[in-house]
Regions:
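A short helix-loop-beta submotif of the ANL/AMP-binding
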Residues: 64-84, 88-92, 101-106, 207-208, ...
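Conserved AMP-binding/adenylation subdomain of ANL enzymes
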Residues: 191-208, 215-256, 270
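A short N-terminal helical cap/helix-turn-helix that marks the beginning
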Residues: 2-23
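Structural core segment of the AMP-binding/adenylate-forming
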Residues: 81-149
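Conserved pre-ATP/AMP-binding loop-to-beta segment of ANL
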Residues: 4, 19-20, 140, 151-172, ...
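Conserved structural elements of the adenylate-forming
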Residues: 37-46, 164, 168, 183-204, ...
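Gly/Ser/Thr-rich phosphate-binding loop
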Residues: 229, 254-258, 268-336, 347
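Conserved AMP-binding/adenylate-forming core of the ANL superfamily
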Residues: 3-4, 22-66, 70-74, 91-96, ...
């Protein structure tokens, strides 16, 4: 696939070239093809225009890792809104801080999810300033293949964005003080690291990559872009229970696993409980992000899961992914080693 300037252009081109390719699945048995993702995003985008969302509207969204969330993310990219994905575990202090700092115009929430009333939180924040609330209801698990999303008439949609260089994504990291640190990204910066990263691990349409982490992390958009670029299928899990989720993931026969130390600890514990037979027999590589992977953990993953090691990419929020560690093999390496990704335009010294 040739390069695209905008996130929406990537979605459109994939849907045109590979309409029936499965790009997303979840643990409820639902799937979305490239064409279904495009169509659902356009319909949702049309519905969101009725809530006053359009080009340049600042939208903070706090949604779990579901098909609906991926569609909302793409719908906002279609509209050219400025989207600010935030972690579902954030509460009044963090969410209040970022919505005030960004002067958020629309806040999208999942309703009551995992026992917490996000609408009540949103209303308490909206009482302090002018901010509209949009509900994407996640209070009940899916009962069938239908998406829990609003739908609208696509004829009302504005033209899609044409520039991939406008800052339309704002991600927050914890930083080094108590206040979250916001980072502005463009479509091109979100997509750049994914394109290089998948070349590094050789992702293809034969790959199945489970996503048990919050897709409101920049890795969510980056992995979706990677899937659209390569045909790699993403399987979404809205929660991660270290006792049960590794076995649920195993049922999808993943070829890739990620993404951070707690997940790998859970995968290895599940493998030990499973016995000598590989729990993940199709697994060929592991990818990490969020925080550096220690050589010791890489060694344990090699020995327990039978893969060459872990390709580690960190600081994705602060800047596009520009380098990943080599997949560690052989003796434990002290310190860190990185390979700059091709076509990123970064020099090291």
């Amino acid at each position: 696939m040739t390069a695209t300037d905008t996130f929406w252009e990537l979605v459109e081109r994939t849907a045109a070239d590979h309409p029936d390719r499965l790009v997303l699945a979840d643990d409820f048995g639902r799937t979305l093809t490239a064409a279904e993702l495009r169509d659902a995003a356009e319909s949702t985008a049309a519905a969101l225009t009725a809530d006053g969302i359009g080009p340049g509207t600042v939208v903070t969204w706090q949604l779990p890792t579901t098909l609906e969330t991926m569609v909302v993310m793409v719908a906002l990219a279609r509209l050219g809104a400025v989207q600010n994905p935030v972690l579902p575990i954030w509460r009044e202090a963090e969410l209040g801080f970022v919505t005030r700092q960004l002067d958020t115009e629309v806040l999208i929430v999942p309703g009551t999810w995992r026992g917490y009333d996000h609408v009540a939180l949103a209303k308490s924040l909206a009482a302090e300033r002018d901010m509209r609330i949009v509900l994407i209801d996640h209070s009940v698990d899916p009962a069938g293949p239908a998406l829990r999303l609003p739908a609208g008439e696509t004829s009302v949609l504005p033209p899609p964005p044409t520039s991939g260089d406008a800052a339309r994504w704002i991600y927050y990291s914890s930083g080094t003080t108590a206040a979250p640190k916001g980072v502005r990204h463009t479509d091109r910066s979100v997509m750049a690291g994914s394109a290089g990263g998948v070349r590094m691990i050789g992702a293809s349409s034969d790959d199945v990559n489970p996503i048990p982490f919050p897709v409101s992390h920049i890795g969510g958009a980056a992995m979706l872009a990677a899937g659209l670029l390569t045909g790699m299928r993403l399987v979404l899990f809205d929660t991660f229970d270290p006792e049960t989720t590794p076995f649920a993931i195993a049922r999808h026969r993943p070829t890739l696993l990620g993404t951070a130390t707690p997940f790998y600890v859970a995968y290895m514990a599940a493998q030990r409980r499973h016995g000598q037979r590989p729990l993940f027999p199709a697994l060929r590589a592991c990818v990490a992000g969020g925080a550096p992977i220690t050589p010791e953990l890489g060694r344990r993953v090699r020995e327990t899961l039978g893969v060459p090691g872990i390709a580690d990419a960190v600081r994705a929020t602060s800047a596009p992914v520009v380098g990943v560690s080599p997949i560690i093999g052989g003796a434990v390496v002290r310190g860190m080693a990185d390979h700059c990704l091709p076509a990123i335009g970064v020099e090291t010294s």
